[in-house]
Amino acid sequence: MRRRLLRAAVLAPLAGTLATLPGCSLPVQVDGTFLQPWRSHLQWGLADWQRSLKVAHTLGCRQLVLQWTGIVGGSDGDWSLPDGSLQQLFTAASENDIRIRVGLPFQQRWWQAIGADDATLQAFLAESLAHARRWLAQTPWAQQPAFEGWYLPYELEQYHWADPARQQWLAQWLQGLVQAASARGGDCAMSCYFSRLQTDGNLVTLWQAVLAHAAVRPMVQDGVGVAGAGNVQQLQPLLDHFHAHSIGFDAIVELFRELPGGPADGSGFKGETADAARIQRQLAWARDSGAQHVLVYALEPWLTQDTPQAAALRRRWGLPQ
């Protein structure tokens, strides 16, 4: 799942209706949520962050993964959340007893680089590591009381990383990122998903190579939003490996479904909020997976937006309209 493309489906959230929530127990509780910021979040004030974090708190969230703090090399130019916005996020998080895992700036060239030749990939890894080191050296967020750790905003899958040499380059790159991040304080987490593209690679071998060099916390996407319910079966060998080696991981439940008719490469993604029954089955899988935490992707926008599908999910989850 290329989450960079999900912005195509993002609609304006209900700004006020979810701000005041009932005190009753809700039928769904999750450990955390992602938040994928876009340029529209540059306009958010403290009240917007408070609204978003209040919804998360009501559903039991104790962690929010800020997918990235900005984008480098995007088609509409570089941008980043200003310090004032991030401070407001941390303020709202502290008010709601939620800890923030801060995503590094996302290098948009990632998707092109991992599909390119070896020289292009190696150049990208070197340049992006240097950029991340510079950013980490000056960022203050690890000192915030609500700071949980760092998130590396690059998703691993077995298709582009089947070659052992590339696995080693990836592992060394991640080792550099982890070292730079840990110098500021805090661990690093990174997501993975099962690619439907035909390949000789597999996620177990990939994570073995990564964890031999870099102490990265795995976060496993269920992939149901794009690949369907059967995708979780493809993840079982990886989960078995984590269990056998006592490797802690988190599970990510996708709250959306991809609408048919989009390009096969994932560009121009169009999606909508999934139905509550499907999501309930996903949550049951995640809780039975052995994951230490179950996170959803994502309350914003798939629960909060002003669509009939999101409204139906709010009703099922006992939230006001």
Question: Each predicted region: which residue ranges?
Answer:
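Aromatic-lined substrate-binding rim segments of carbohydrate-active enzymes
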Residues: Q50-V55, V65-R109, R166-R184
